[in-house]
C-alpha cells in the first residue's frame, strides 16, 4: 500500500524548557537520543533542555541542537511504538531539514548535532540585522515591498503569513511600507540575525566544509527542499540544499503543496509544538495535520 504520510519537522522558535523531559524519564529510546547528542557535542545540552534556564536554551547555538534532539527523541519513541507510518516524503522548516534527514536515515544523529550546533554558533557570530513577520499581505505585494526597501523575503510560511530579513533600518522602512500597502500586522521577531538572507553568506561559507565532509546516504523517502520544493534523494543535491537554505527563502507554502502533489494527505509534525500543524491546513485545505507531541503524553 502506498503511503499518504509526510513527516515534517519544526525549526527555530518551537523550543521550551522542559521539552522531552518526561519522555526521557520513561523511555529508554528517548533517553538514548538525548545522551547521544550530549556525547556528540561534548557537554550536557540535555540539562539545558530539561531544566533551563530559558535564556540559555533560546541561544541559537543551543536552540538548534536542542530542537533536533527533542524531535528525534519523539521520533524514536513513535517508531518504537509502531505509531508512525512510513513516509511518502519528508520535509523540515529550515533547521528541521537536518532533523528530517536524520529521521529518513540520510544523516547520522551525531553528525547532524555537531553541524547544527556550529550552524547556530555561526549565526550568532554573524548576527547582523533582524526579521519581521508580515501578516495579511499578498506575497506579490510583499515582494515588491522587499525590492523597494532592500530587504529579502525569508520565509513564505502560509498564505498571508510571511517574514522579511534585512538590516534594521531597511526593516523599519519595509514594515512601514507593508502597513501602507495593506498589511494587517507587522511583528518584530525575537531573533539575533537576518536569517535566510544574503547577510548569512559568511555562515554558509564557514559551514560548507562540515556539510561536505559529513557522510550522507540516500534517504528512505525524498526530502522536499525548502529552497525550491524539489524532491531530493541524491546526497550531493541534499548537501547543496543545506548550504543554499542558509541564505535562501524557506518556501514552506510550496513545500507543503509539493508534498501534497507527492501523495501526502497526513502530515505528522514530529517535534515540540504545533506551529507547522497550524500552517499546513491553511496551505492545502482538507489534509490532516497531526502534532505528535500530545500523542506522547
Task: Give each language-model segment a name.
Residues 3, 85, 181, 218-219, ...:
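Structured loop/turn residues at beta-strand edges in well-structured enzyme cores
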Residues 29, 66, 70, 170, ...:
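Charged catalytic carboxylate motif
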Residues 247-264:
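A short, acidic, amphipathic alpha-helical segment used as a generic capping/interface helix at domain edges
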Residues 1-141, 154, 185, 189, ...:
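FabD-like malonyl-/acyl-CoA
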Residues 79, 179, 260-263:
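Non-catalytic positions within long, well-ordered alpha-helices that form the structural scaffold/packing
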Residues 12-14, 41, 103-249:
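Alpha/beta catalytic cores of group-transfer enzymes, especially the acyltransferase/condensing modules
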Residues 94, 215, 263:
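Conserved functional loop/turn residues at catalytic and ligand-binding sites
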